[in-house]
Regions:
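Catalytic core of PPM/PP2C metal-dependent serine/threonine phosphatase domains
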Residues: 20, 48-117, 135, 187, ...
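Active-site metal-binding loops of divalent metal-dependent hydrolases
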Residues: 39-41, 109, 153-154
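Small-residue (GG/TT-enriched) beta-loop-alpha framework at ligand/catalytic clefts
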Residues: 118-130, 170-172, 181-184
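Sensory/regulatory domains in signal-transduction proteins
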Residues: 13, 32, 100, 117-124, ...
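N-terminal entry segment of metal-dependent catalytic domains or homologous docking segments
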Residues: 1-56, 131-133, 137-139, 188
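Short Pro/Gly-enriched beta-strand edge/turn motifs at strand-loop
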Residues: 4-10, 72-75, 174-177
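Acidic loop->beta-strand submotif enriched in PP2C/PPM serine/threonine phosphatases
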Residues: 17-33, 86-89, 120-160
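C-terminal catalytic subdomain
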Residues: 77-78, 144, 149-199
Length: 199
């Protein structure tokens, strides 16, 4: 599996803060990989603690299920966020053999695909822990060298491959770092989680 898919993430707190309210989650399973990006409302330590707690809820859930789905994972996050300040998130699952899967989300965590076909996926408004209307997962069929990005609203969505010519060539951790460093906004927590299908 790891020979076909690689993953990476990078999280940077906003200016003046030492901890971020964004958190990335990557978990390789026997047949694929689940990747998630969580953006808690607010900044600083309290937001960071909640973001970590939410990703830990995903980790615990994955120990109990055989076939995870992004929609079920988002429901886990929604329940874990009840009684808190709330968060937005996106979750994707990719099968390691077929490179097919799906992605879903709530709120303004973005999803973009680069490589064989450029695609931008936006999600309905909402807030985990408060209001989360039913979601229809978006199907994905990736190809070798395709790159799937999940990124928070602390990263500008107004960039394209011409501004990052080696986007589909770099290792996943390098891509995540470069997306945040090049296109991140200093006034907000910025984060990016990456799945890259190797050529």
């Amino acid at each position: 599996m790891r020979s076909k898919i690689e993953a990476g993430d990078y999280v940077r707190p906003c200016d003046g803060e030492r901890q971020s309210g964004d958190a990335a989650f990557v978990q390789f399973q026997d047949d694929g990989v689940l990747i998630a990006l969580v953006d808690v409302l607010g900044h600083g330590k309290a937001a960071h603690v909640l973001a970590v707690s939410l990703t830990e809820s995903l980790s615990k859930w994955l120990r109990e299920v055989r076939s995870p789905s992004p929609d079920a994972a988002l429901s886990v996050l929604h329940e874990a966020a009840r009684g808190t300040r709330g968060a937005v998130a996106s979750v994707a699952w990719i099968n390691a053999t077929t490179l097919e899967g799906n992605v879903t989300g709530i709120g303004n965590v973005r999803c973009r695909l680069f490589g064989s076909a450029a695609k931008t996926i936006k999600f309905d408004d909402g807030l985990l822990g408060f209001r989360a209307r039913s979601r229809m997962p978006v199907s994905l069929a990736l190809m070798p060298a395709d790159v799937l990005l999940l990124f928070s609203d602390g990263v500008s969505e107004r960039f394209d491959a011409s501004q990052y010519p080696t986007l589909t060539l770099d290792p996943a951790p390098t891509i995540a770092f470069n997306i945040v460093q090049r296109f991140g906004k200093g006034r907000d927590d910025a984060s990016c989680a990456v799945l890259r299908c190797k050529p």
